[in-house]
Amino acid sequence: CSNLSTCMLGKLSQDLHKLQTFPRTNTGAGVP
């Protein structure tokens, strides 16, 4: 990655998107 901040932000957003799309089975009220 060229920019660490941008790369981390992208990874974070991707992870958040995955968490939001996945069914809430293991994560109770962890995701808003």
UniProtKB/Swiss-Prot annotation:
Cellular compartments annotated: Secreted
Chain segments annotated as transmembrane: none
SMART domains reported in the protein's UniProt record: CALCITONIN
Proline amide: residues bearing it: P32
Keyword presence, Disulfide bond: yes
Origin: domain of life: Eukaryota
A GO CC annotation given for this chain: extracellular region
Secretion signal span: none
Keyword annotations of the record: Amidation, Disulfide bond, Hormone, Secreted
Xref: PROSITE patterns: CALCITONIN (PS00258)
Pfam families, per the entry: Calc_CGRP_IAPP (PF00214)
Role according to the record: Causes a rapid but short-lived drop in the level of calcium and phosphate in blood by promoting the incorporation of those ions in the bones.
Family to which this protein belongs: Belongs to the calcitonin family.
Additional free-text comment from the UniProt record: Calcitonin 1 is less active than calcitonins 1 or 2. Only this species of salmon possesses calcitonin 3.
Protein name per Swiss-Prot or TrEMBL: Calcitonin-3
Native organism: Oncorhynchus kisutch
